[in-house]
Amino acid sequence: MMSRYEELRKELPAQPKVWLITGVAGFIGSNLLETLLKLDQKVVGLDNFATGHQRNLDEVRSLVSEKQWSNFKFIQGDIRNLDDCNNACAGVDYVLHQAALGSVPRSINDPITSNATNIDGFLNMLIAARDAKVQSFTYAASSSTYGDHPGLPKVEDTIGKPLSPYAVTKYVNELYADVFSRCYGFSTIGLRYFNVFGRRQDPNGAYAAVIPKWTSSMIQGDDVYINGDGETSRDFCYIENTVQANLLAATAGLDARNQVYNIAVGGRTSLNQLFFALRDGLAENGVSYHREPVYRDFREGDVRHSLADISKAAKLLGYAPKYDVSAGVALAMPWYIMFLK
């Protein structure tokens, strides 16, 4: 029996829609772009290249046909500018709002810019999408919203206090989305991402995520630093699972809308386990790394453990993650080796 996602992938090429991806030059945005263009959809992309890269768009172009690429319209603009948002939303059926300044440490160092992008920018996008009468608005929420609540697995309706300015911004997004559905009858779905990883996730810069950062260090023969004792755990989610969730959410029925969903695999991996998984993944691709990890202080604003209950997304969206951590690492490694060597 076909999964809901497999059915959707069959349906979409027969009835192309217009999709807007904000943050299209970023990690998740460029993977959404690749999938939608390969499904013969029309895509508008908005990005200001604050954290996204032209090279991600160039890579997508190399992976699709010229005809598919001609279905893509890129707008260089900023979600903090309402005119840019209005321009991007014109004639769009589905919005996939990924643009944001990620990273807990970045938000601690510069809460004002995080607020301007993640809250003011989000509100601009809601207004523009509402006024353009789009069919649905799917946005990147975050597992950071669970804050200091100790319960595992994380269930959507039980959250704690935020532990960082970033977590505050992502929670405010959920509140605004909920209010827009109540006040304006506007359909939104929030996807609480848990530690997404995969191809095109940037290994460079001060705020690189753990998997690309460690992989880069290993390939270059540098030390790998673990904050804390290494028993901190996360629910790592390969990018293809996240793409699946976005497409299912955008096209979901009315009963599934105006809610938030955990998007993960529902499995916990400690940082120590992750270290060995990455080392093994590199070894399978002919890259050896013989150093042991270097442990240092636990990082401010980080939660100790994270594990998602994904039953709500499974039930209401038909979400069925296909890739666990080891499968995701196996798929991502050749890309990292090519990119970093």
Curated annotation (Swiss-Prot):
Stated consequence of mutating residue 209 to H: Alters substrate specificity. Mutant is much less efficient in catalyzing the epimerization of N-acetylated hexose moieties and is more efficient in catalyzing the reaction for non-acetylated hexoses
KO phenotype (gene knockout): Deletion of the gene causes deficiency in B-band O antigen biosynthesis. Mutation does not affect flagellin glycosylation.
Activity's dependence on pH: Optimum pH is between 7 and 8.
Subunit structure: Homodimer.
Family the UniProt entry places it in: Belongs to the NAD(P)-dependent epimerase/dehydratase family.
PANTHER family: DTDP-D-GLUCOSE 4,6-DEHYDRATASE-RELATED (PTHR43000)
Protein name, UniProt field: UDP-N-acetyl-alpha-D-glucosaminouronate 4-epimerase
Native organism: Pseudomonas aeruginosa
